[in-house]
Structure formats: C-alpha cells, structure tokens
C-alpha cells in the first residue's frame, strides 16, 4: 500500500496518518526526517544536502527525490509507505512518475477553509504542561485558564487567524495544484496510475478514520 496524503494545514492529516500506518503496517515518510537521517548517516546525498542547508539554501528536488528512492528500498517499506509532506509541488510529483515510483492511492482530506480557521484559531495552550484546549470543542472550565493550575492559556502565533489564513493561501497556491495533477493522472487510466480519493475531513476523528480506511480498502 503506497499512499500520498494531501490536505490543508489543520485538515487532520497527522491523526489519519497514524491510523493508516497502523492498519497497513507501513512507515510514514517525511522529507524532514529523511533529510535529518541522511545527514546524520553521512550518505553522499546527505552530505550534499547538508552543504546546501548549512548555506541557508533550499534542498533541490533532485536531492529530495534521490533520498526518497533510497528510503523506499529499505526493509520497512516492504508493505509500502505513506508519504507525508511529499510531493509538495508539480515538478516533484512529475519526477516521481518519471522515476517509476508507483503510488496506489492519493488521499485528500477535504476540509472547508473556514472550518480549518475555526479549528486552528480556537486552540489555546498551557505552555508549562503542553495541555491543549479549544474555545469551542474542548473549552477549559474557566475561560482562558488552565483547568489544573489556573494559569493563563495562550494562543500560539501559528494559530492566530491571520497566520492561519496565510498558511491556507500558501497551500492553495503551492500544494492545491497537486490535487488536480493526481486527479488528471487517475482519470488517464494507465495501469500504474494511482486511485484518487477525496474524503470529507469533518465529523469525529473515528468517522474520518473509517472513511479513509474504507476508501483504501475499496
């Protein structure tokens, strides 16, 4: 089972990725983890990537794709893999196709922008303990205060509405085109084309999990 998981920030990809990993016994592969592992191991690609990162540059698609191809040959990928945060761009997606890296399913967790803004901008955190609340879905007993200590709760900068809107704009501009790319690929009917599945990312976590797993088994 080789899966790409797409969805806007706040759509719940991280939670669903855990369920997919456990259900199909496949590793979750993120480019960040891959880069760190390759740099630590001192592989040729890792050293190349380190040189770029130390200079403050962005690691090229060629290096990323090389790391991906190396990573998916490892033993834990025998049953497949789940790509997390990759591909991010059309050139990366095209390179995967050209390099013969077949994907079985592309799953999009679909959530309306306004719902995401409400989810993220409503989060409040107790910094000392890491406890997370939500003004609507999981409010503290006393507004703005941690249940256990009575300390003030804070809103992380990342969760402020303006920041969330900017992150969604970046997603729509950069990653959203991937949805169209994979939809087109799926409709071309090639034998190795992935199946494209859109899953509604609203409702309880268990409801969404059931929809995702049912789509992957379908």
Swiss-Prot record:
Q: Where is this region: LID?
A: 122-159
What does the UniProt entry say about where the protein is found?
Cytoplasm
Q: Which GO terms describe its molecular function?
A: adenylate kinase activity; ATP binding
- Region NMP: start and end of each range? 30-59
In this chain, ATP is annotated as bound at 10-15, 123, 132-133, 203
What interactions and quaternary structure are annotated?
Answer: Monomer.
Q: What does this protein do?
A: Catalyzes the reversible transfer of the terminal phosphate group between ATP and AMP. Plays an important role in cellular energy homeostasis and in adenine nucleotide metabolism.
Q: Know the name of this protein?
A: Adenylate kinase
Organism (species): Alcanivorax borkumensis (strain ATCC 700651 / DSM 11573 / NCIMB 13689 / SK2)
* Lineage of origin: Bacteria, Pseudomonadati, Pseudomonadota, Gammaproteobacteria, Oceanospirillales
């Amino acid at each position: 089972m080789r899966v790409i998981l797409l969805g806007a920030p706040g759509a719940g990809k991280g939670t669903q990725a855990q369920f997919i990993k456990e259900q199909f016994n496949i590793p979750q592969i993120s480019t960040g983890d891959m880069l760190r592992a390759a740099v630590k191991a001192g592989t040729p690609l890792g050293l190349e990537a380190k040189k770029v990162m130390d200079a403050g540059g962005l690691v090229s698609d060629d290096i990323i794709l090389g790391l991906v191809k190396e990573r998916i040959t490892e033993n834990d990928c025998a049953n497949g893999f789940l790509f997390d945060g990759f591909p991010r761009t059309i050139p990366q997606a095209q390179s995967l196709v050209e390099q013969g890296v077949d994907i079985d399913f592309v799953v999009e967790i679909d959530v309306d922008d306004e719902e995401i803004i409400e989810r993220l901008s409503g989060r409040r955190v107790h910094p000392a303990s890491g406890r997370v609340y939500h003004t609507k879905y999981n409010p503290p007993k006393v507004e703005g205060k941690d249940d256990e200590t009575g300390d003030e709760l804070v809103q992380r900068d990342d969760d402020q509405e303006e920041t969330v809107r900017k992150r969604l704009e970046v997603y729509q501009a950069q990653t959203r085109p991937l949805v169209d790319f994979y939809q087109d690929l799926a409709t071309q009917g090639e034998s190795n084309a992935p199946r494209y599945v859109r899953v509604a990312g609203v409702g309880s976590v268990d409801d969404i999990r059931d929809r995702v797993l049912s789509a992957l088994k379908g």
